[in-house]
Amino acid sequence: MAKEKTTLPPTGAGLMRFFDEDTKAVKVTPKGALAIVLVFILIEVLLQIIGPRIFG
């Protein structure tokens, strides 16, 4: 006797979505991310300029 083949349910034509639900995470807009990066750059520049005077 031949073995029966088991078939799996279709997965949406090969496309799978892992994050269908909204996750509970911090949401940052692109403008917010840019602002955070610019603040870090400004802090770095200031530390390069006045850091040696403060930290010896």
Swiss-Prot record:
<keyword id="KW-0812">Transmembrane</keyword>
<dbReference type="Pfam" id="PF03911">
    <property type="entry name" value="Sec61_beta"/>
</dbReference>
<feature type="transmembrane region" description="Helical">
    <location>
        <begin position="30"/>
        <end position="49"/>
    </location>
</feature>
<keyword id="KW-0653">Protein transport</keyword>
<keyword id="KW-0472">Membrane</keyword>
<dbReference type="InterPro" id="IPR023531">
    <property type="entry name" value="Preprot_translocase_SecG"/>
</dbReference>
<dbReference type="GO" id="GO:0005886">
    <property type="term" value="C:plasma membrane"/>
</dbReference>
<comment type="function">
    <text>Involved in protein export. The function of the beta subunit is unknown, but it may be involved in stabilization of the trimeric complex.</text>
</comment>
<keyword id="KW-0813">Transport</keyword>
<feature type="topological domain" description="Extracellular">
    <location>
        <begin position="50"/>
        <end position="56"/>
    </location>
</feature>
<dbReference type="InterPro" id="IPR016482">
    <property type="entry name" value="SecG/Sec61-beta/Sbh"/>
</dbReference>
<protein>
    <recommendedName>
        <fullName>Preprotein translocase subunit SecG</fullName>
    </recommendedName>
</protein>
<comment type="subunit">
    <text>Component of the protein translocase complex. Heterotrimer consisting of alpha (SecY), beta (SecG) and gamma (SecE) subunits. Can form oligomers of the heterotrimer.</text>
</comment>
<keyword id="KW-0811">Translocation</keyword>
<comment type="similarity">
    <text>Belongs to the SEC61-beta family.</text>
</comment>
<keyword id="KW-1133">Transmembrane helix</keyword>
<feature type="topological domain" description="Cytoplasmic">
    <location>
        <begin position="1"/>
        <end position="29"/>
    </location>
</feature>
<keyword id="KW-1003">Cell membrane</keyword>
<dbReference type="GO" id="GO:0015031">
    <property type="term" value="P:protein transport"/>
</dbReference>
